[in-house]
């Protein structure tokens, strides 16, 4: 079979594989959230039974009792919720600035929920001891508080005294965003040494992941010994427990697409940390935790330990600010910018910068695209010249192929000599595409993973740049009263992208190889179906980029 025919078949098969592969792996409808449970707590160098009891269902507040438990109300411009005085558990947290969907009556996003509720998710900071004769605060301890409300302007002070006279103090502060600071002080008024270990845990019932999980990390995550550690829920489930011996723990937590809960331990110590899974009472439970080495408090002395909990939206500038202010290494990597991090984050900064002036991320995308196009103009011009020369050389290349058809080595040698003589780079025509690939994926990542793009409108029917175009030509863009299946959701922006791509192809020099030229003619149609499920912000970028390319090609054709 002719090699060109083989290449054509391979190209068509590859294109179809991309389309259906994308549909299978990335465009599945969002699954319903499952009602399952979160994790047990384990650690080395500690009485395992005591540590396990911290997060066992038996110690959880029952559903019917949850409303009766005394609580400290949380109130800030970003958060509302409460902290249970019983067990001092952060288990009720709502993100005031974010709605669950675009509907008018949509409730705000709930991050934390009490144990034994439908979407149980909570955090704890506390103390344990391997000395059985000493009673420390635990999940059943009811703390005394000097205030009923925690706000950025008013910290809350709590205390509890055991039968030996040992006093435990906790001061909780919250900033205007999503960071809690918990300072624990132990005053040893007894006549015995007190060995303690500080711990922190985040405990969560497993829920099904959002769509497109293959291009986005969701699950346990952290920075340990200045290295980013990411584990999928399946990884932890298979291993049951992933342990790290004493090490520098900057932060560990659980991340979703847009939300993060994270423990940030005191920097004065090293910690053992664990990512755990357990199946309890028919539900799956996941937990991340850290625990310090034993610290001994002598009689008459005291010890203070400061830890933090981040629980909120993964805003880029906010994570950057915390990383710098509190020296939290790699905190911005909680946002999955992907392999092209070095490009993706600057692209986001550029979009966010122009958003500050125009107030619309869609317009910001248009401005950034113009800048990228201007930066690449010289390269595009060189590419055009190279493609033009290649087309002019095609008759001579065909002559050489006929002359040395049976001598592949001589054939390649003669063709390379021709390129050298005519000063033609055969791959120069591909350079703009190769350069644009990381830019394309960077813009896609920015649109898909950054909270700033979530529910960000453009104009008209586009209410969310991070979601696909909601219209489709198969019901005449909403004029006909029926909803086509998902693979036929081909909206106005995908169609505009395909049309502008076709027009740009018509203005560009034709490829010298007729088989490749035929394949390229099908690309707008292939891309129409493949990209219809992409975030509409990406289609706006691609369409606008095609329009600029048409203008650029007109200029190059006229002056070259």
Curated annotation (Swiss-Prot):
Membrane-crossing ranges are 5-25, 334-354, 357-377, 431-451, 476-496, 522-542
The annotated topology with respect to the bilayer is: Multi-pass membrane protein
Q: Which UniProt keywords apply?
A: Cell inner membrane, Cell membrane, Chaperone, Membrane, Protein transport, Transmembrane, Transmembrane helix, Transport
Gene Ontology CC, one term: plasma membrane
InterPro entries on file:
Membr_insert_YidC, Membr_insert_YidC_N, YidC/ALB3/OXA1/COX18, YidC/Oxa/ALB_C, YidC_ALB_C, YidC_periplasmic_sf
Q: Which GO terms describe its biological process?
A: protein insertion into membrane; protein transport
The protein's matches in Pfam families, at most eight in alphabetical order, are given as: 60KD_IMP (PF02096), YidC_periplas (PF14849)
- Where is this chain's protein located in or outside the cell? Cell inner membrane
* Principal place of residence: membrane
Q: Give one GO term, molecular function aspect.
A: membrane insertase activity
Domain of life, per lineage: Bacteria
- Which proteins does it associate with, and in what oligomeric form? Interacts with the Sec translocase complex via SecD. Specifically interacts with transmembrane segments of nascent integral membrane proteins during membrane integration.
**Purpose of the protein:** Required for the insertion and/or proper folding and/or complex formation of integral membrane proteins into the membrane. Involved in integration of membrane proteins that insert both dependently and independently of the Sec translocase complex, as well as at least some lipoproteins. Aids folding of multispanning membrane proteins.
HAMAP family (UniProt xref) = YidC_type1
List the NCBIfam families.
PRK01318.1-4, yidC_nterm, yidC_oxa1_cterm
Family to which the UniProt record says this protein belongs: Belongs to the OXA1/ALB3/YidC family. Type 1 subfamily.
Q: Which PANTHER family does the annotation name? A: CYTOCHROME C OXIDASE ASSEMBLY PROTEIN COX18, MITOCHONDRIAL (PTHR12428:SF65), OXA1 (PTHR12428)
- Please give the name of this protein: Membrane protein insertase YidC
Organism lineage string: Bacteria, Pseudomonadati, Pseudomonadota, Alphaproteobacteria, Rickettsiales
As recorded in Swiss-Prot or TrEMBL, the protein's gene is named yidC
């Amino acid at each position: 079979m002719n090699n060109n025919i083989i290449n054509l078949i391979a190209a068509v098969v590859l294109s179809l594989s991309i389309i259906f592969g994308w549909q299978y792996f990335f465009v599945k409808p969002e699954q319903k959230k499952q009602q399952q449970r979160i994790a047990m707590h384990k650690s080395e160098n500690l009485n395992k039974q005591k540590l396990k009891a911290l997060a066992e269902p038996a110690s959880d507040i029952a559903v019917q009792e949850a409303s009766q438990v005394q609580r400290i109300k949380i109130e800030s411009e970003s958060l509302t919720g409460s902290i249970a005085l019983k067990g001092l558990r952060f288990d009720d947290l709502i993100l005031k600035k974010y709605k669950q969907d675009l509907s008018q009556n949509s409730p705000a996003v709930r991050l934390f929920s009490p144990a034994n509720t439908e979407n149980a998710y909570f955090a704890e900071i506390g103390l344990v001891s391997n000395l059985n004769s000493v009673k420390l605060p635990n999940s059943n301890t009811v703390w005394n508080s000097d205030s009923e409300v925690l706000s950025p302007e008013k910290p809350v002070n709590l205390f509890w005294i055991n039968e030996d006279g040992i006093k435990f103090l906790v001061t909780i502060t919250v900033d205007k965003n999503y960071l809690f600071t918990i300072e624990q002080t132990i005053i040893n008024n007894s006549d015995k040494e007190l060995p303690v270990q500080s711990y922190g845990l985040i405990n969560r019932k497993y829920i099904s992941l959002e769509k497109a999980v293959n291009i986005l990390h969701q699950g346990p995550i952290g920075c340990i010994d200045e290295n980013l550690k990411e584990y999928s829920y399946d990884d932890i489930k298979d291993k049951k427990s992933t342990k790290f011996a004493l090490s520098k723990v900057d932060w560990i937590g659980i991340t979703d697409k847009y939300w993060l809960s994270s423990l940030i331990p005191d920097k004065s110590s090293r910690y053992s940390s664990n990512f755990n899974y357990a199946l309890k009472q028919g539900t799956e439970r996941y937990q991340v935790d850290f625990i310090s080495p034993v610290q001994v408090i002598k009689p008459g002395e005291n010890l203070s330990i400061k830890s933090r909990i981040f629980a909120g939206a993964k805003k880029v500038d906010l994570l950057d600010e915390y990383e710098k202010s509190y020296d939290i290494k790699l905190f911005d990597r909680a946002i999955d910018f992907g392999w092209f991090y070095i490009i993706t984050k600057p692209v986001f900064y550029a979009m966010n910068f122009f958003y500050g002036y125009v107030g619309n991320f869609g317009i910001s995308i248009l401005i950034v695209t113009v800048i990228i196009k201007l930066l690449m103009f010289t390269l595009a011009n060189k590419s055009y010249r190279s493609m033009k020369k290649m087309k002019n050389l095609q008759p001579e290349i065909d002559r050489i192929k006929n002359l040395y058809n049976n001598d592949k080595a001589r054939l390649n040698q003669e063709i390379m000599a021709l390129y050298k003589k005519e000063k033609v780079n055969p791959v120069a025509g591909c350079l703009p595409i190769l350069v644009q690939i990381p830019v394309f994926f960077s813009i896609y990542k920015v649109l898909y993973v950054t909270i700033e793009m979530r529910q960000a409108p453009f104009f008209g029917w586009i209410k969310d740049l991070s979601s696909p175009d909601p219209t489709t030509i198969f019901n005449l863009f909403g004029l006909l009263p029926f909803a086509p299946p998902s693979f036929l959701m081909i909206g106005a922006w995908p169609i505009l992208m395909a049309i502008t791509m076709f027009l740009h192809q018509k203005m560009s020099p034709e490829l010298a190889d007729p088989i490749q030229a035929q394949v390229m003619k099908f690309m707008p149609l292939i891309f129409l179906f493949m990209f219809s499920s992409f975030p509409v912000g990406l289609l706006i970028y691609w369409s606008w980029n095609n329009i600029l390319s048409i203008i650029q090609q007109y200029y190059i054709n006229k002056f070259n």
